[in-house]
Amino acid sequence: MNEFVESMAQVVTGVTVVTVKDERDDVGVTVGTFTSISLDPPLVMVSLDNAGYLNELLLRHDRWAASVLSAGQKTVASRFATAGRPGARLLLAGMPHHRGELSGALIVDGGVTALEAETVKVVPAGDHTLFVAKVLGVDYVDASVLPLSRYRSRYR
């Protein structure tokens, strides 16, 4: 298994923060598996660890947001990747963000893009769950900034 983990560490991935608002708080997590899977209709997919709290929340709440981070947002990525982290509002305190009109979820400003989505299909996949979602709207696109990436277990 360690060989498989090492193999996957060689794959460059974008870094995205996925957020959802539940009855009590805003919750989010840093993910490396977020991608477009269809242009017509516009569909995206995120893969979440079955043991994670966000996985549990997305099984109960269909609408969520994805903020694709820019190269200058390593701190945001690290905050949302830390185990035992507080709610998303505290993690984003002092950082530019806003609430999405379509999902109600927090959106990180200053990334390369952000969108709001609604889950249309849930696919169990080993120790993860794939959430396929229709794009409700693109919140912003900023082609002037470079994306944050993860390669060999480090943000770059």
Q: Which stretches of residues belong to each language-model region?
A:
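Basic, polyanion-binding surface patches
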Residues: M1-R156
